[in-house]
């Protein structure tokens, strides 16, 4: 990391030194043209890169005026496969057409793990020092110094190690296979809180182990107590094939639910719990057949789950544990009607008959207001400076005009060392165009966004993870929750209009104690978030460039503008870390929730209930 950091520090965006030669990468959508000699190239001599960048930006701008997508013609990748790919065949036994031979059982009130399978263990846990299965980094021990605030009645004492009790013994075996040595701060508290039967609202900095924070205690309690009796079926025989999960995890995007499912497979390995995943954009018939084979822990995107409930394929009558991950993003994306339909209108046990856990890196007041309907006597857990960034991330803000962004990015990539680089842009067409430019400059890159098919997105993510294409250009679809090992550099090519999105984007690096670098291209078009950006840098003890201070002073003449400010409740971002029950005054009326649906970036909330539409989020 020091090599990369030194390279970035010494980077001169006006440097005319030619980049080192790279092997030509030909993506599948260009393979035919390359074979026939009809491929196009936008390459320019390295010693005139800045002028070439301006020309490319001009082409990019014109493509919008002409309603053209640019030269990026199609989706990347031709199918599922590869290590850990989400193939619909035999995926370690969990998706096969037969019972996984390593699956455990629950007999006479006791959990009986299944036999070990070395091939499955290598597939889902990797081997020691496998870079694709990154765990903790050199700064992980610093997490012990992070302040933790837990508020509520009778807060259980935190744990300091993975032990039994409170964790079930077989879960400890799987945690050891995953090479997790000690709990993160959020896990130290969440495990005893859930074991005590309490509800939880947990806020923790991104990369702090939130997924383990809910999977560990939920699976542990499931292993201890076993499955619930399945209700006796009634009605036609063909309606009997219905899943009755005991745990439900809701998350906003396909990528995040897929990632949580992959983690659930690890920690449910050889247990009686069979995890399943459902999300839009994939074959619903295959998903229905999969859950019919047994589903004890269901990870789901809200829209697809509503569809399966309506089809009579999933019942929520047996739910003991409900987890809402990235709850603020689900509301921003307009999922509140679906979430309320799932929790309050689908036969799920009421708030007093289940445990409910809400996890996210930010919990603004409108989400805490939602908690009064979904949680009972909950514990509010704030780990570190929630809504801020990790000091493991070195943040650099460069002043770059729009017309110079391409050349600036090319210079950064030329100086980059080993590791993965994630580049964020604001638009889908912008992602495709920039990816095409990078490929024409011999940088192996791919892209993901909401218009890509699920097959193409999974393939692109897999090739990014394994380093085949170490540069990924992404829109906000990849910004929240994804845990991709070895992302050493995040570039905000286009800064978002919401500072929380910035926090989540750069949180793709510097995870679990590892270090990373985040570079942002800033100009006066981003003055709406300049004050909050300065606050973020100061909170993480980063350098604040003079041009940010100057822009902030200029913006002050126009009043205290800025981004969304998380609902404008009057305290800005810092108040999103607090338990509003301590402040008194109540939460107001339920009618306030009507304004939460349909964030400005995602359209109206009602569109997410239309399963027949061309919707990329459910």
UniProtKB/Swiss-Prot annotation:
Domain Helicase ATP-binding: 191-381
CDD domains in alphabetical order: SF2_C_DEAD
Superkingdom field: Eukaryota
Binding-site residues for ATP, renumbered to this chain: 204-211
Residue spans of biased composition, Polar residues class: 37-46
EC number: 3.6.4.13
Enzymatic class: hydrolase
Ranges of biased composition (kind: Gly residues): 71-96, 558-573, 595-612
Record's compositionally biased regions (Low complexity): 55-70
Residue numbers spanned by region Disordered: 1-116, 552-618
Role according to the record: ATP-binding RNA helicase involved in translation initiation. Remodels RNA in response to ADP and ATP concentrations by facilitating disruption, but also formation of RNA duplexes.
The protein's name in its UniProt record: ATP-dependent RNA helicase DED1
Organism, scientific name: Yarrowia lipolytica (strain CLIB 122 / E 150) (Yeast)
């Amino acid at each position: 990391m020091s090599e990369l950091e030194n390279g970035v520090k010494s980077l001169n965006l006006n440097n005319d030194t030619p980049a080192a030669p790279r092997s030509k990468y030909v993506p599948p959508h260009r393979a035919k043209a390359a074979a026939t000699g009809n491929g196009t190239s936008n390459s320019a001599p390295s010693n005139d890169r800045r002028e070439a960048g301006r020309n490319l930006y001009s082409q990019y701008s014109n493509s919008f005026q002409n309603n053209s997508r640019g030269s990026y013609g199609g989706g990347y990748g031709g199918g599922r496969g590869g290590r850990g790919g989400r193939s619909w065949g035999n995926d370690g036994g969990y998706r096969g057409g037969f019972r996984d031979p390593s699956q455990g059982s629950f007999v006479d009130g006791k959990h009986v793990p299944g036999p070990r399978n070395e091939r499955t263990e290598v597939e889902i846990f990797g081997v020691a020092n496998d870079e694709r299965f990154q765990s903790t980094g050199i700064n992980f021990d610093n997490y012990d110094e992070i302040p933790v605030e837990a508020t509520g009645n009778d807060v259980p004492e935190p744990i300091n190690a993975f032990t039994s009790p409170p964790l079930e013994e077989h879960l400890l075996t799987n945690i050891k296979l995953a090479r997790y040595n000690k709990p993160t701060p959020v896990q130290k508290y969440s495990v005893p809180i859930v074991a005590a039967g309490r509800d939880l609202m947990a806020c923790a900095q991104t990369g702090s182990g939130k997924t383990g924070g809910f999977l560990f205690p939920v699976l542990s309690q499931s292993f201890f107590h076993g499955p619930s009796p399945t209700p006796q079926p009634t009605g036609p025989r063909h309606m009997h094939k219905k899943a009755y999960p005991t745990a439900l995890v809701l998350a906003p995007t396909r990528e995040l639910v897929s990632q949580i499912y992959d983690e659930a497979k690890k920690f449910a390995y050889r247990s009686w719990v069979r995890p399943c995943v459902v999300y839009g954009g994939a074959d619903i018939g295959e998903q229905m057949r999969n859950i019919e084979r047994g589903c004890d822990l269901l990870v789901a995107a809200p829209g697809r789950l509503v569809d399966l409930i309506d089809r009579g394929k999933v019942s929520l009558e047996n739910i003991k544990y409900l987890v809402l991950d990235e709850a603020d993003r689900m509301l921003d994306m307009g999922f509140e009607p679906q979430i309320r339909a799932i929790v309050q209108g689908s036969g799920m046990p009421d708030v007093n008959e289940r445990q409910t856990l809400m996890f996210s890196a930010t919990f603004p007041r409108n989400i805490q207001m939602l908690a009064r309907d979904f949680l009972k006597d909950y514990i509010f857990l704030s780990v570190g400076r929630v809504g801020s960034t990790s000091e493991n991330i070195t943040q650099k803000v460069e002043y770059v005009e729009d017309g110079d962004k391409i050349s600036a990015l090319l210079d950064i990539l030329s100086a980059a060392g080993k590791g993965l680089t994630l580049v964020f842009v604001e638009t889908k067409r912008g992602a495709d165009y920039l990816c095409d430019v990078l490929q024409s400059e011999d940088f192996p890159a791919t892209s993901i966004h909401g218009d890509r098919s699920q097959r193409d997105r999974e393939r692109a993510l897999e090739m990014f993870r394994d380093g085949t294409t170490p540069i990924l250009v992404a829109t906000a679809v990849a910004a929240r929750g994804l845990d991709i090992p070895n992302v050493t550099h995040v570039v905000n090519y286009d800064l978002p209009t919401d500072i929380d999105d910035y926090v989540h984007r750069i949180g793709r690096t510097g995870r679990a104690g590892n270090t990373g670098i985040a570079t942002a291209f800033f100009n006066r078009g981003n003055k709406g978030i300049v004050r909050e950006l300065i606050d973020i840098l100061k909170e993480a003890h980063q350098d604040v460039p003079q041009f940010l201070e100057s822009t902030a002073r200029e913006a002050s003449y126009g009043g205290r503008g800025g981004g969304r400010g998380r609902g404008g409740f009057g305290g800005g971002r810092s108040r999103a870390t607090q338990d509003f029950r301590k402040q008194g005054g109540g939460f107001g009326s339920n009618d306030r929730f009507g304004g939460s649906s349909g964030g400005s970036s995602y359209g109206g909330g009602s569109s997410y209930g239309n399963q027949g539409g061309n919707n990329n989020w459910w």
